[in-house]
């Protein structure tokens, strides 16, 4: 039997798909790639935007049309956040919530045996535990992703994720370290600690993210640790100082911004100002001293009430920080969130235009940041081979490079000298 997965959304979803792939492989299934025939098609959905829901439905409809005898499965955040809507999507033979995935294999087998359509969505409950979905290997990735936390206790005006993911639940440290040892034994040298609210790790168990990072760095074989998205207001000076002392931690910080305008941040119900965000960036740079450090972020354009002046202020803030990479999104009016009913909704054309302008500016900033690294040296994790000797990869700072590495293979770490940015990657040479 063959199963095909389609994953939307964040690194947590990527990790969870890896766990599901492993579950099916362990029970005799072969994992098919996109475009290949399969007996089961599973979409691990993202519901951050309405567009994400549409993509999930469109993919399953197409697979059902092309493979009328196959079993189709809708799982992930979409059915968990909007169970009634997802349950009505009849092209999915199994609709499965985030808390019901341990039974996904049994339910798929029932459907293969002729069982009628199944809807299994358990609502989140106070006091629920972290769902263990360990992964031993990521078939198409040279870095490993370890899910360490689930859920979010915040209530940002635009975000449906607390509804989809429930309250903060931290994974047991021993379980994380055991999985990390398995991954290093399988040859992985870089691990990404992923979570829905990474700085919240340990809030419910009496520990914290710094303690976890220190323990992960002590695992033999691991050479690089990378952090997922961080909320700036949760990074205390002590937290920052201790992180900067961990040599194996990649000095790249993805600090969630959403807007560089304090008035917009307040409407979003974010709990920091633009000035406080900048202070955290300064504290991180000070903690690293002369060592290089990079910053990446996300930014929303066209949030309700955002004026042209607010937007321009946000753009200026991006210049002030000097981000290596900015993920720019037009605001998506999401049902089930407070912002859905906010007045002063920005017209779709204006949201798209502001996104275009900000993307162009973010690329200019990126070029300026990368120009400063020409001639410097760093380590690169070799990832995708473009030819027999040419590889793409990322430095510790998360600079994308292309390098000729004869005699090396994907998953190895090599030392390089950085060259010019070609608009997609930095050209590098082994030194």
Sequence positions of predicted segments:
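Proteins enriched for Cys/Gly/acidic motifs involved in redox and nucleic-acid/cofactor modification
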Residues: 1-201, 238, 253, 274-289, ...
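Terminal RNA-binding accessory module
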Residues: 341-431
């Amino acid at each position: 039997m063959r199963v095909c997965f389609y994953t939307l959304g964040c690194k947590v979803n990527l990790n969870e798909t890896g766990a599901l792939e492993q579950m099916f492989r362990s029970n005799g299934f072969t994992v098919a790639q996109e475009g290949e025939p399969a007996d089961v098609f599973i979409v691990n959905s993202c519901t951050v935007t309405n567009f994400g829901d549409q993509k999930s439905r469109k993919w399953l409809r197409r697979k059902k049309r092309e493979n009328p005898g196959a079993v189709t499965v809708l799982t992930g955040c979409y059915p968990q956040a909007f169970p009634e809507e997802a349950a009505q999507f009849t092209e999915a033979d199994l609709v499965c919530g985030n808390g019901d995935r341990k039974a996904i294999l049994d339910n798929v087998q029932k459907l293969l045996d002729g069982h009628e359509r199944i809807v299994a969505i358990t609502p989140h409950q106070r006091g629920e535990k972290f769902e263990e979905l360990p992964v031993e290997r990521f078939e198409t990735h040279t870095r490993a992703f370890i899910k360490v936390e689930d859920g979010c206790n915040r209530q940002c005006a635009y975000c449906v994720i607390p509804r989809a993911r429930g309250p903060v639940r931290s994974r047991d440290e021993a379980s994380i370290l055991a999985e990390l040892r398995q991954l290093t034994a399988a040859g992985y040298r870089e691990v990404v600690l992923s979570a829905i609210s990474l700085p919240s790790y340990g809030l419910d168990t009496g520990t914290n993210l710094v303690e976890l990072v220190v323990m992960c760095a002590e695992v033999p074989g691991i050479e690089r640790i990378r952090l997922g998205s961080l909320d700036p207001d949760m990074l205390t000076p002590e937290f920052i100082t201790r992180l900067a002392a961990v040599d194996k931690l990649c000095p790249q910080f993805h600090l969630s911004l959403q807007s560089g305008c304090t008035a917009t941040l307040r409407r979003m119900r974010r709990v920091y100002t633009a000035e406080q965000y900048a202070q955290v960036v300064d504290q991180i740079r000070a903690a690293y001293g002369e060592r290089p450090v990079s910053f990446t972020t996300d930014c929303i354009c066209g949030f309700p009430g955002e004026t042209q002046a607010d937007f321009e202020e946000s753009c200026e803030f991006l210049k002030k920080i000097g981000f290596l990479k900015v993920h720019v999104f037009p605001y998506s009016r999401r049902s089930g969130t407070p912002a859905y009913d906010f007045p002063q909704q920005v017209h779709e054309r204006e949201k798209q235009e502001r996104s275009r302008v900000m993307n162009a500016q973010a690329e200019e900033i990126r070029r300026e940041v990368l120009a400063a690294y020409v001639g410097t040296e760093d380590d690169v994790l070799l990832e995708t081979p473009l030819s027999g000797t040419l590889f793409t990869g990322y430095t510790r700072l998360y600079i994308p490079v292309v390098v000729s590495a004869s005699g090396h293979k994907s998953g190895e770490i090599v030392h390089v000298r950085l060259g010019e940015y070609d608009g997609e990657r930095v050209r590098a040479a082994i030194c």
